Design a protein with these regions (language model features):
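N-terminal secretory signal peptides that target proteins for export/translocation
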Residues: 1-3
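Bacterial N-terminal signal peptides
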Residues: 5-15
Length: 349
């Protein structure tokens, strides 16, 4: 076994820094690569959902403070300020919880992949992280070992989760700043400078709060189902590649798993827009888009890159939200399973 392992590493060393063909089969113990990929995929879905929930826990409360709490300028302590002070305490704990979740994701990757030699984490015929070396370099991390791979994965997931949340809740960065909740210099949440104010009409404020909550729930739900379904498909294909390479029966079985997974994703996509409609139907969209409302117009530049040139109706926003979540879901899979594109092509996806 030692001799086989040494030959495997030598083969990998000769392959770097170029890309090793997937058919060359130089993995010392394919079971370990499958375990590694499974750990990353599991951690990916869990982390994104946890971070979305934590961001929601903080910003939803702050949003409720400014939109639904009656102000009283004559009171010694304005009720809105009292509400924000309470939320500041909650949000401080949220920031700590996010940092802990990021560390837990890093630890899960390390635990799941530490049995592999670093070359097998990198090589294109194994876990495949050399395939996204440039993307990681663009994030400021050069891939040399498992620690750098974990750093790249977690960093990308941190940003991707924040971008998802910002599309659901454009004022998120502003609301975090309102209670001094600092996610650090690398945060991808943007403060669009809304001033921290809510609308004057408390009835409208409650309607906006309901709409906002519904959008966040719908967006997170779609992302969660997409990540889980894609992970099931890619895991099945990767197991065939590593444990039963060239086995047509294995691929045929994986194909069925993938067909079911993509069917689930398509079904969830169809639910997204009606869910937004249900939550936001009572809101006049013209009252939702200003900065003191839901600030949807702050997404115009990003939506334009997704083929939505303006946001003047709820339909424009829903289309942008879906396309953004679809794209980021694909991006998350690329960083969780760099070989996903190659594997999916084997079953026509």
């Amino acid at each position: 076994m030692r001799i086989a392992w040494i030959f495997a590493l030598l083969a990998g060393a000769l392959a770097l820094p170029g890309t090793t063909g997937a058919a060359e089969r130089f993995v010392a113990d394919p079971r370990l690569t499958v375990d590694c990929e499974a750990a990353i995929l599991k951690g990916s879905g869990a982390f994104v959902q946890q971070k979305l929930k934590l961001l929601d826990k903080c910003t939803a409360g702050v949003f409720k403070c400014i939109q639904t709490t009656p102000p009283d300028d004559d009171a010694e302590d304005d009720p809105v300020d009292v509400c924000l002070e309470k939320m500041a305490e909650r949000c401080a704990k949220t920031v700590e919880a996010i940092a802990a979740a990021e560390q837990a994701f890093t630890d899960a990757i390390t635990k799941g992949c530490s049995a592999l030699h670093p070359l097998e984490v990198l090589r294109a015929d194994a876990v495949g992280y050399e395939l996204i070396a440039q993307q990681c370099s663009d994030l400021g991390t050069d891939l040399t070992d498992l620690a750098s791979v974990a750093q790249c994965i977690v960093q990308e997931h941190e940003c991707a989760a924040e971008r998802l949340f910002q599309a659901e809740h454009p004022r998120a960065g502003e609301l975090l700043g309102l209670v001094d909740a600092d996610l650090g210099p690398d945060s991808c949440l943007e403060d669009f400078g809304g001033g921290g104010f809510g609308v004057d009409d408390l009835v409208l404020g409650k309607q906006l709060d309901r709409c906002d909550a519904g959008v966040r729930k719908a967006g997170a739900g779609f992302t969660g189902k997409k990540q889980k379904s894609l992970a099931q498909c890619v895991s099945a294909l990767y197991a065939c590649d590593q444990l039963a390479f060239g086995n047509a029966e294995c691929v045929a079985k994986a194909q069925k798993t993938c067909d079911k997974a993509f069917g689930t994703i398509a079904g969830e996509a169809l639910k997204l827009e009606p869910s937004v409609d249900k939550s936001c139907a009572v809101v006049d969209f013209s009252q939702a888009v200003p900065d003191e409302g839901l600030a949807f117009t702050e997404l115009v530049d990003e939506c334009d890159t997704l083929g939505v040139s303006d946001i003047v109706t709820i339909d424009h926003y829903k289309t942008c939200l879906y396309r953004q979540h679809e794209c980021i879901g694909d991006e998350l899979m690329q960083f969780a399973a760099p070989r996903a594109t190659e594997l999916l092509m084997r079953v026509g996806r």
